[in-house]
Amino acid sequence: MSDLEAFRSEIRAWLEANCPPEMRQPANDEGDVCWGGRNFQFKNEAQRQWLEVCAAKGYTVPDWPMEYGGAGMSAAQAKIWREENARIGARPPLSSFGIWMLGPALLKFGTEEQKRHYLGEIARGEIRWCQGYSEPGSGSDLVSLQTYGDDKGDHWLVNGQKIWTSYADKADWIFCLVRTDKANKYQGISFLLFDMASPGVSTKPILLISGNSPFCETFFDNVAVPKSQLVGELNRGWDVAKYLLGHEREMISGAGGGDRTAAIGPAMARNGIHDPLLRAELAAFDVDALAYSAMGEKFLDEVKVGKGHPAQSNMMKYVGTELNKRRHELFMAAGGSRALEWESESTGGGATPRTWLRTKANSIEGGTSEVMLNVIAKRILELPGA
């Protein structure tokens, strides 16, 4: 037996012994997702137990170094961990912008003190983070942002507004792009971390067409941010932001992969499955989702050894977005007119149509599909500009 085969056997046995049965079922609503944080309310004891046993082993961030709360797995071992979790249908023990976005940025740009302070909290699910990038007048043209940090010696005094801040009303801390030099558009932005409980921080939820409010407006009114909470170099926050955006797009693109039966299974139980055209669409989706998952694994392997194309995350984001939208279009097609019911048992109390509506935003968040296609054309296909 090879070392990797032995490792797979070890992980398989550990999962069988430690993953509660309740955590081996698909997440049906927001309460089934463990976000962690100071004020997070566990849905049940199984959810709490699953986070605690995984955090104790470093399995919430398996490929992070052990000294920062991870398990120190190699790329091959982390792939086995993901495969074995998928095999039993295990839910992620922790979902976190800290894991998906801030953590990788801190590992690359953070000071040793920042890594030791923040990464362990992220890995254990003790702090919930949100991202402060977009502003009312700065979306696709992010470098035009106006939130300003006035240098006061040992701290910055931050004033401004962010928008589309996911779960800002529930987050403990925010990683934020702040202008610290008004004279230079690109080299005048810094990447700051600050506590959402700081005086002067306020949030206002934004109601979406789906009926939910996962996004917020976030306001900063004379918020004091210590100089020790600067990540990377002063006025070079755009370097950190570009690196982090790649991880954000990987996160959003992940919605297109996952369990391929997530679209096919529900459709099989509905009358629409008898439609031969729908059956053909389901088969095509299954093939494309499998190809996408394989592409994602290849990309992760390349990133781990420093060979990933800088623009590949744009491609993953675009394809993942389109797949996720297709997935939910198939839900609706299979359900027929009844799938539009907002309050019925067959649609999970309206979860099916609400989620279908929510997926329309996938084409905008994290960079619009049009912007992604432009980047792919220029940086991967090397097509000439207009």
Task: Write out the residue ranges for each language-model feature.
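A short core secondary-structure module
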Residues: Q146, D154-H155, N159-S202
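N-terminal glycine-rich flavin-associated loop
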Residues: L94-E113, G139
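C-terminal helix-coil-helix/basic helical segment that borders enzyme active sites and/or dimer interfaces
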Residues: Q25-N28, I273-R279, L290-S346
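Glycine-rich phosphate/cofactor-binding loops in nucleotide/flavin-utilizing enzymes
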Residues: A76, I80-W81, M101, V240-G254, ...
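Amphipathic, small/basic residue-rich leader segments at the start of a protein or domain
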Residues: M1-S96, H117-R124, P266, P276-A283, ...
